[in-house]
């Protein structure tokens, strides 16, 4: 069974090419695969398939709204094995992998997800240097879910609930310094209102917008702290702009894994950043079977 390993600003993934969607991605095998001691280690798993194959295999009962049967489909699983609607960094790595593996010849195409279609653009992709790419993903229009609060690292933050295809609570703290953000225990479990977010929520803590940029850390549901979160950076950008009384704009979001650029318009949003493919290899069939239970 072939695999690839890649990351987008150190948000890392195991990619499983499965064009017929035949693999049984049980929570047990996904969590084992993502375990950094007993598996390959990753923040999540990306099954590389098509929407038609996923539908035929019963991955979903009907095509997600706006996704065509002929579209590529990113079947994304969190590190705990749960299914996620969307992953911005994952889409960038997914699109990069398709080009690098010669599964796709275009630099502009659509990747389907549970959250709907995500148009992608690879900028100046060079087949002679396949391991690196710069990718923009159109993330769609965000929806505001109202204000809320969460306790992160023993400190309560107030934030803005934002739907980016998955739920976020982006907390801008105008008094937070870079040093305080770096010292915050984001890895510890976060406390939030389950009535507001019954399916869980990704929580971002960020500094105020200064010189066209913010700094952010994130606790992802089903994963814990990650070095980056693509949908989280979009949510952070929306919250930072709202803090300034703006609804549209472009800014850089600094995360522990690097820097991405987010643009928010009246009708949609865009995420641009790097992708890197680290390795390809073969999973032992015996290992896979032993972790299906």
Curated annotation (Swiss-Prot):
The keyword Isomerase belongs to this UniProt entry's keyword annotation: yes
One protein family per Pfam: DAP_epimerase
Annotated residues for binding of substrate: 11, 78, 88-89, 166, 202, 220-221, 230-231
Top-level EC class as recorded in UniProt: isomerase
Keyword entries, A-Z: Amino-acid biosynthesis, Cytoplasm, Isomerase, Lysine biosynthesis
Catalytic activity: (2S,6S)-2,6-diaminopimelate = meso-2,6-diaminopimelate
The UniProt record lists the keyword Isomerase: yes
Subcellular location: Cytoplasm
Gene Ontology MF annotations: diaminopimelate epimerase activity
Known partners and oligomeric status: Homodimer.
Family listed: Belongs to the diaminopimelate epimerase family.
Name this polypeptide is given: Diaminopimelate epimerase
Organism (species): Mycobacterium sp. (strain KMS)
């Amino acid at each position: 069974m072939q695999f690839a390993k890649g990351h987008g600003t150190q948000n890392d993934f195991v990619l499983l090419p499965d064009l017929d969607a035949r693999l049984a991605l049980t929570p047990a095998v996904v969590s084992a695969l993502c375990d950094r001691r007993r598996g390959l280690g990753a923040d999540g798993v990306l099954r590389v398939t098509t929407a038609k194959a996923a539908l035929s295999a019963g991955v979903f009962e009907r095509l997600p709204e706006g996704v065509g049967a002929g579209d590529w489909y990113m079947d994304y699983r969190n590190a705990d094995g749960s299914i996620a609607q969307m992953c911005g960094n994952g889409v960038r790595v997914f699109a990069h992998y398709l080009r690098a593996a010669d599964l796709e010849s275009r630099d502009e195409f659509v990747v389907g997800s549970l959250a709907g279609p995500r148009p992608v653009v690879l900028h100046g992709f060079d087949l002679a240097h396949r391991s690196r790419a710069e990718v923009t993903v159109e993330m769609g229009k965000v929806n505001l879910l109202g204000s809320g609060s969460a306790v992160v690292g023993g400190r309560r933050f107030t934030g803005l609930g934002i739907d980016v295809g998955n739920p976020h609570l982006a907390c801008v703290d105008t008094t937070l310094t870079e040093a305080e953000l770096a010292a915050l225990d984001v890895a510890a479990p976060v406390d939030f209102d389950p009535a507001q977010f019954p399916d869980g929520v990704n929580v971002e803590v960020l500094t105020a917008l200064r010189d066209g940029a913010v700094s952010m850390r994130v606790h992802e549901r089903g994963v814990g702290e990650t070095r980056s979160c693509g949908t989280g950076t979009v949510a952070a950008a929306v919250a930072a702009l709202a803090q300034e009384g703006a609804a549209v704009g472009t800014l850089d979001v600094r995360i522990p894994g690097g820097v991405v650029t987010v643009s928010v318009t009246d009708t949609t949003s865009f995420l641009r950043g790097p992708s890197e493919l680290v390795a390809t290899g073969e999973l032992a069939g015996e290992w896979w079977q032993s972790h299906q239970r």
